[in-house]
Amino acid sequence: MWNDARTINLIANTLAVLAVAAMLLAGVAWVAQRPYFTLAAIEIESMPETEMHYVSTGAVRAAIAGRFGGNFFTVDLDEAREAFESVPWVRHATVRRIWPNTLRVRVEEQQPLALWNENQMINTWGEAFTANTGELADDMVLPHFTGPEGTESLVVQRYAELARWFAPLDMHVRELVLNPRYAWAVTLSNGMKLDLGRDPGADAPDPHGLPGALPFAARIQRFVQAWPVVSSRLEGRTVTQADLRYPTGFALALAPLPPEHASHSKSKPAKKR
């Protein structure tokens, strides 16, 4: 074999190529470790066509300090993205390299829709998140949602439907509860509490709705349609609670008469439609 010139040339050429490749790799590794490529800046900006109301660049930098390492070449972008997305009020982040020593981060901020259970909020995408409610604007009053874990999207969907149904009555939802039995209760802006009963659509949460939820919707629409006539016959009495679970109507609980009227009028029993 060693007398074969072609074989010897092939081996020599192969060794030469490997040697050059090793030298190139060593050179690249040496250059990559130069201080020139140490990350010197992190640019933080909002996603296109959005604004940041709760996320400050200073708070983000403080929160991610020491969370990931490396230089322009070696930084793990997925690890960096996860670090940024762990910052309160950050829903999603994208991270890219900007030559020669900068990371550019685009942040999508959480859009709070309601308070969720004990100590979380829920966003407009139907996702639960944790952040400081004390950072909300002073004039922002959020409704309060309660429900089992994993029902966030369903609760947001039902909230949107309820808001649409009660809008003609100049009422909005102040509190929405989905209990472990998947029955709903609502408190409206006028303080009236509604027992809505079980929602067939809640047994299989679907952000696009299910035909099985029709009976649930029908109960509410029946109440909304009847309310203008019913309220006109209450003689100024306040309804504290409405039970919509009856198959052919609903029952009302009335607040007690003021003391000055109690002697002139008997308390009326709950009405049923």
From Swiss-Prot:
Q: How does it sit in the membrane?
A: Single-pass type II membrane protein
One GO cellular component term of this record is: plasma membrane
Q: Name one GO biological process term.
A: FtsZ-dependent cytokinesis
Question: Which cellular compartments is it found in?
Answer: Cell inner membrane
Bilayer-crossing residues are 11-31
Ranges per topology, Periplasmic: 32-273
Q: Which family does it belong to?
A: Belongs to the FtsQ/DivIB family. FtsQ subfamily.
The annotated subunit structure for this chain is:
Part of a complex composed of FtsB, FtsL and FtsQ.
The protein, known as: Cell division protein FtsQ
